[in-house]
Amino acid sequence: MKRTTRYSRKYVPSIDGLRALAVIAVIAYHLNFSWAKGGFIGVDIFFVLSGYLITNILLTQWEKNQSLQLKQFWIRRFRRLIPAVYVMIVVVVIYSVFFHPEILKNLRGDAIASFFYVSNWWFIFHNVSYFDSFGLPSPLKNLWSLAIEEQFYLIWPAFLLVFLKWVKNPKLLLKIVIGLGLLSAVWMTILYVPGTDPSRVYYGTDTRAFDLLSGCALAFVWPFNRLSPVVPRKSKAVLNIAGTISILCFILFTAFVSEYQPFLYRGGLLFVAILGVIMIATISHPASYLSKIFSFKPLRWIGTRSYGIYLWHYPIITLTTPVLEITQPNIWRAILQVAATFIIAELSFRFIETPIRKNGFINYFKGFKDKNYFIWKNKPVGKWLSIAGVVAVLAIFTLGMSNVLSVNTNAEKQQTSVKTTTSTPDEKKDDKKEDKATKDKEADSNKASEQKETQKPDNKNKSAATPKTIITQTVAIGDSVMLDIEPYLKEAVPNITIDGLVGRQLRDAITTATGYKKFNSENSSVILELGTNGPFTEDQLNDLLDQFDKATIYLVNTRVPRGWQSDVNKSIANAASRPNVTVVDWYSRSSGQSQYFAPDGVHLTKAGAQAYVAMLTSVMNK
């Protein structure tokens, strides 16, 4: 394969600057900053960059030896990636044993899948969403992207070796790579279902291959060790303009794109990959002014440690953020979390990643074994303390990964008991005095909040416009929150029909509603409580509301500590423009009321269920 003049560039500092930009975007996204709701696209930049750099290495190796030396390549990759991630997994499991035992049951499977770099498929097959989950998210969920990269490192060199041996035409080879990337992007479009959680297409190696292959394609036409530092003025201007536009587009995507926007999975992420190609091409070019900007020393420091930063930031954030505050970033907590991430990443870089990458596993452990950090009475006490510490760590890790610790059962019982207290009608009789006291205590706050709930511009004076219709039948359709309030709602609204289902999403309710056609009449009221389990489009919401266009609809908004909360509530607020729809504002009513929620921050305690029903019936009785 003919290539242009070689320039001596084994290290491109601006590439580390680009890594820094990508990892900062990802951290800001996981901290739930409103200005970085699209920060997840930083992972796409990492993918494109990996494809570019690895293919550069392999093509250079082929030019030298007409061989890819796959064994040496894979050993180098394992040295670079495995030690740090294995240490992180062990530390997270041990930390969870002591401080978050309730997550151990699910964490075991996540850890094993992460050890073998198949966590992305593990999350797909176990329906673990990247964008949402009730309760404390898995602290290992960020390892899905490393799983894809490791799978790429195993598969791509073998494919490339076949291509290089059998496809002699470089243009044809480039077309094959581009074609495979386009097939991956089309496959994502085919699999994606609007209004549903996009995690299947987001996690899948098959549906994310276009990111990596975009970088691979760039390596064929833009090898960084062939880029001349001297170019014509016009070419330099093109580089600078294209690079600036691509950076601005990346910033705009980071600030304004949401993970639930359908266009992302219908070509949007492919566009991000193309942006990544342009960013890499311009930032890596020595003639570009962006190359100098991204070689700024602080950016390079972050970039060289970006692997450790990416590894550690997510478990640190998830394990130190209260469930109810996941969508409410705290600037001081965020500063401490970022500081802890950088410190641990630096320790990992100095004492784990760099020594093993340079010296290999055997020499690293041999050197560790031969060093005596603490001598007492001519005895290597430090060595034995180190060995004892390693044994203790492995013992605790083994216990955490086994079923010996039954803490998960206790956590499950706690969550089950929450549901039982809100689902057993008999308990209401025993606790009648308590219920009355609770209602009296909340009466004043209910009045104030309920006035706010029903006097918003879209709902105001709806009942005054027409004579009040006598309601003779009511149906309530919802998810597991509806099951939480069911016994209290039945007591407050006699003869009500309640249809609650765990995990129900709005798209499911559209089908469910067809079975309740008799409630689409002027003397009927319909309560809709949906949005807890995922987002929906306004078209889907309108399809549901259209089925009850003659009935009086009470549409309850949601409080769920997940990213789609604001989008769901915005769609619900827009529906208030319909003359037969009244929005009931549970989001405002439950603000600051942590006692209303179970540990997962979504389902209701007894007090929460009672407050919910009191709010709902107050609005219905107006």
From Swiss-Prot:
The chain crosses the membrane at residues 11-31, 39-59, 81-101, 143-163, 173-193, 212-232, 237-257, 267-287, 307-327, 334-354, 387-407. SUPFAM superfamilies: SGNH hydrolase. Disruption phenotype: Cells lacking this gene have no O-acetylated N-acetyl muramic acid residues on the cell wall. Sensitive to bacterial cell wall targeting antimicrobial molecules lysozyme, beta-lactam antibiotic cefotaxime and Staphylococcus gallinarum lantibiotic gallidermin. Impaired postinfection intracellular survival of bacteria inside human acute monocytic leukemia (THP-1) cells. Killed more efficiently and rapidly in mouse postinfection peritoneal-elicited macrophages (PEM) and bone marrow-derived macrophages (BMDM). Keywords: Acyltransferase, Antibiotic resistance, Cell membrane, Cell wall, Membrane, Secreted, Transferase, Transmembrane, Transmembrane helix, Virulence. It comes from the Bacteria. It is a multi-pass membrane protein. GO terms for biological process: lipopolysaccharide biosynthetic process; response to antibiotic. It is an enzyme of class 2 (transferase). It is found in: Cell membrane; Secreted, Cell wall. InterPro entries: Acyl_transf_3_dom (IPR002656), Acyltransferase_3 (IPR050879), SGNH_hydro_sf (IPR036514). Residues 413-424 have a biased composition (Low complexity). CDD domains: SGNH_hydrolase_yrhL_like. Pfam families: Acyl_transf_3. Signal peptide: none annotated. Its main location: membrane. Residues 425-461 have a biased composition (Basic and acidic residues). The active site is at 480, 600, 603. GO terms for cellular component: extracellular region; membrane; plasma membrane. Residues 412-467 are annotated as: Disordered. GO terms for molecular function: acyltransferase activity, transferring groups other than amino-acyl groups. Its EC number is 2.3.1.-. The keyword Endoplasmic reticulum does not apply. Belongs to the acyltransferase 3 family. PANTHER family: ACETYLTRANSFERASE, ACYL_TRANSF_3 DOMAIN-CONTAINING PROTEIN. Responsible for O-acetylation at the C6-hydroxyl group of N-acetylmuramyl residues, forming the corresponding N,6-O-diacetylmuramic acid of the peptidoglycan. O-acetylation of the peptidoglycan is the major determinant for lysozyme resistance. Critical for virulence and escape from innate immune response of the host. Involved at both early and later stages of listeriosis in the mouse model of infection. Required for successful host colonization and for intracellular survival of bacteria in macrophages of the infected host. This is Peptidoglycan O-acetyltransferase OatA. It comes from Listeria monocytogenes serovar 1/2a (strain ATCC BAA-679 / EGD-e).
